[in-house]
Amino acid sequence: MKVSKLMEFNREQIEKNFRERIKGLSSVFGPSGFEEEVAELIKQNLADSDFTHSTDVLGNLIYHRKGTGDKKILIAAHMDEIGLIIRHIDSKGFIWVDTLGGFAPQQFFGKRVIIKTDEGKHINGIINSLHLGRPDRCTTMPSSVHEFFIEVGCESRQEVLELGIEEGNAVSIDYPVIELGKYKLGGKALDDRALVFILEEVVRLLQGREDIPDLYAVFTTQEEVGARGAIVAATNIKPDIAIALDMSLATDIPGVPESEYINVLGKGTSIKVMDKLSTCIGGLIAHPQLVRDLKKVAKDNQIPYGIEAYAAGATDASFMQTLNGGIIAGGVQIPMRYVHSYEVVDVRDVVDTVELLYRYILTQA
């Protein structure tokens, strides 16, 4: 990699890189707790990086570069995707599952899935659809994932076991990456693999630079089930500042009043001010100075951005903020439609987010 300079940010090249790498990042298998293949792909993508890298006991992949600045900054993007885990294989060879992360039952019907065995083999399967022979089941929505099963073409439990499939194996729902018009792409696990790309790209842009802070780029595990990887990483690293990279709900779609928009697709990056798990429990109120600093960088460099002031859910930053006596924490995101299903992003928002993070880091040296 060549040493980059601040004024040489090339939007066209970043967009090209995203279109080339997101297909691999999206398709790779990585439900919560089973992120090894994602980590291996990231290491391939960053094979030429001059950052050192290591892996901790929870599987977080940590890239580190000690610049000339005194501030220790942790930027996190989670590797895991929502998925399923096998809880039972019945006598007829049907596979019953539970969730890894936040699924709604209506997202399961008729989906293609990939099961990964302990030996690393990928096996195709299909989730059942509505029962056309039972009209009552065509008008009611299943209330639980326990009403769904996976078909792998076997006729007995023993036949399933002979494929290498066992209880405890993880399952990924498969959506191929597709291009939608000029700027949009749809795919699986863009939450958070689009942000994994962004963090990879920031590491690549900082190749050879000394005028950066003490920077940790952390590809975290198990965010979708409680930010477990980020908690461990931040506890061990003890950063002064922690920024979580994640999606922001793009709700600019039919049926949603404009007053309820959280973010808008194609209008720039997103700076988080607040999120929450419930009315008064959990979530994040981003540190005001960090929000001001990010907004200033965006304005100074004419980077379009939106503000996320409210949303259900939480990110890695929500859990890192109160560690080690308190961390300056916040979030930078990309707007995303149809989260936790066939997710859609805009490549312009991705490029804006890369630029915001890159330029922000260079102000912190």
List each model region and its residues.
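N-terminal hydrophobic/helix-forming segments and targeting peptides
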Residues: 1-365
